[in-house]
């Protein structure tokens, strides 16, 4: 594109934004929720220039209130920051707030938002949510993958054994283990292009975690074109689509087996071929859901495992207690899924990790119609951000809220299934993540095996308080620096 043409487009867009800002400034506002002062054009965008926006939003909410209005570029936004306000939204406005705002990258990569997380609320979303919940990620189906988890964990344990006494990159270990478990459950054992697909997925996750001005100024869609971003995304999507199409063809050509042995693509293709759905299932639907299983199932689980180990290495007394819990529950020389059900303290550790280090801000919602929440006017098409981390660290709900204390759940019935609004790492209401059982099963299996088979210490000269807990926030949060720790002995060496 010629420089003059580019300059003209940018200049024209600036003029349009100024006109939009002037019109908006002169338009009388109804009783919106309180919020910080807004700058011309960008509104409150400058206040979210942080690696931890959930912390910034909590700080602002403590000043302006648990329901807070922000203007993020052209996008009116309401932030919900306490369990009581989340309950108000879910119990009285869940259907109205069940839609999703426009997201350019999700539209491209998920086949025009044909996945569960980003699909608009309606008949299609209800249909695929039901399929995913009842067919793909039911308790029975998740249990059917136990042999895959066991095989991959045996492989992971063997890979660590030669490194006993040496420092290892724990993030690499967990990412590889979880990727193998999730990809085998989704794609099956025989998938020629699995590793290429996983590499392409990393490109997608980087795209989702990167800043895109168009998400804040939807009228400037052309910027994605002139900057080359859209062409880059379409190229990645084309590569991805080719790989997924080949994988579907592999599955279609293999002999039909027992339903208990089906991977997730087998299940989707079986449902597609059976018909009887209100809206016929297409190949693009199958590919969008497959991609979602891979991206959502790998990144969030591996991050939770790394955060759990960061906390355990910072709290040796908790590490000692959870290892005792795990080892006393194991009846043989390997961890079984029946054993895990008896690891009560491990489950408290997982719950406390999710409270402090789960998804910090839930996938944005959007209301279809004007409504009132606690007397405040919420105009239609407002982006709704639920700060799950702020709910999990609400001082009116939790004692010593930012300390890692698994024992706080010992006599508590609070669960992470979305009905207790002070702990919502998987969301709540109609839009709750359907993969809770799958994700928790993965996290508990990996943690229990690494805690059972090895003792762990920090590298020489590193103290527990030296572990850097600085966050980097994208879809989830992860430690800014990968955890490096030393496996010092194995169970067999201790016996």
Swiss-Prot record:
Gene Ontology BP annotations: response to jasmonic acid; sesquiterpene biosynthetic process; terpenoid biosynthetic process
Gene3D superfamilies attached to this UniProt entry: Cytochrome P450
UniProt keyword Heme, yes or no: yes
Tissue distribution of the protein: Mostly expressed in leaves and flowers, and, to a lower extent, in roots and stems.
Places the protein is found: Membrane
Cofactor (UniProt): heme
PANTHER family found in the cross-reference section: CYTOCHROME P450, CYTOCHROME P450 FAMILY 71 PROTEIN
Cited function: Involved in the biosynthesis of germacrene-derived sesquiterpene lactones. Hydroxylates germacrene A acid to 8-beta-hydroxy-germacrene A and 8-alpha-hydroxy-germacrene A acids. Unlike 8-alpha-hydroxy-germacrene A acid with is spontaneously converted into inunolide (12, 8-alpha), 8-beta-hydroxy-germacrene A cannot undergo spontaneous lactonization.
Protein name: Germacrene A acid 8-beta-hydroxylase
Species annotation: Inula hupehensis (Inula helianthus-aquatilis subsp. hupehensis)
UniProt gene name: CYP71BL6
């Amino acid at each position: 594109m010629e420089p003059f043409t580019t300059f003209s487009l940018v200049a024209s867009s600036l003029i349009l934004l100024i006109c939009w800002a002037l019109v908006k400034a002169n338009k009388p506002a109804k009783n919106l929720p309180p919020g910080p002062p807004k700058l011309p054009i960008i509104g409150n965008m400058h206040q979210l220039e942080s690696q931890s926006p959930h912390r910034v939003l909590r700080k602002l909410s403590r000043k302006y209130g648990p329901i807070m209005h922000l203007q993020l570029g052209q996008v009116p936004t309401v932030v919900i920051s306490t369990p009581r306000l989340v309950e108000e939204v879910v119990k009285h406005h869940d259907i109205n707030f069940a839609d999703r705002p426009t997201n350019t990258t999700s539209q491209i990569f998920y086949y025009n938002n044909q996945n569960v997380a980003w699909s608009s609320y309606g008949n299609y979303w209800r249909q695929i949510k039901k399929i995913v919940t009842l067919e793909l990620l039911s308790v029975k189906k998740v249990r059917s993958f136990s042999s895959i988890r066991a095989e991959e964990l045996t492989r992971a344990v063997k890979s660590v054994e030669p490194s006993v006494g040496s420092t290892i990159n724990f993030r690499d270990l967990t990412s590889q283990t979880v990727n193998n478990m999730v990809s085998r459950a989704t794609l099956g054992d025989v998938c020629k292009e699995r590793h290429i697909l996983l590499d392409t997925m990393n490109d997608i996750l980087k795209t989702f975690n990167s800043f895109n001005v168009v998400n804040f100024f939807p009228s400037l869609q052309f910027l994605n074109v002139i900057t080359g971003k859209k062409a880059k995304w379409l190229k990645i999507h084309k590569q991805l689509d080719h790989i997924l199409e080949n994988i579907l063809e592999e599955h279609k050509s293999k002999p039909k087996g027992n339903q208990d042995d089906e991977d997730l693509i087998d299940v989707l293709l079986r449902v597609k071929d059976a018909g009887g759905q209100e809206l016929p299932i297409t190949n693009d639907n199958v590919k969008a859901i497959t991609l979602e299983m891979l991206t959502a199932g790998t990144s969030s689980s591996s991050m939770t495992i790394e955060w759990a180990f960061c906390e355990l290495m910072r709290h040796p007394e908790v590490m000692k207690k959870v290892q005792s819990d795990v080892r006393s529950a194991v009846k043989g020389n390997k961890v079984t899924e029946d054993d895990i059900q008896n690891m009560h303290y491990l489950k408290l550790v997982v719950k406390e990790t999710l409270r402090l280090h789960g998804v910090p801000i839930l996938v944005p919602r959007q209301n279809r119609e004007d409504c009132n929440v606690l007397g405040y006017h919420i105009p239609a098409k407002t982006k709704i951000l639920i700060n799950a981390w702020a709910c999990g660290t609400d001082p009116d709900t939790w004692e010593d809220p930012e300390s890692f204390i698994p024992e706080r759940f010992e006599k508590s019935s609070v669960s992470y299934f979305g009905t207790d609004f002070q702990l919502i790492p998987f969301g709540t209401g109609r839009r709750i993540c359907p993969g809770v059982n799958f994700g928790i099963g993965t996290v508990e299996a990996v943690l229990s095996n690494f805690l059972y088979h090895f003792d762990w210490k920090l590298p020489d000269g590193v103290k527990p308080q030296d572990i850097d807990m600085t966050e980097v926030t994208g879809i989830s949060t992860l430690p800014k620096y990968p955890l490096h720790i030393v496996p010092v002995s194995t169970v067999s060496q201790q016996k």
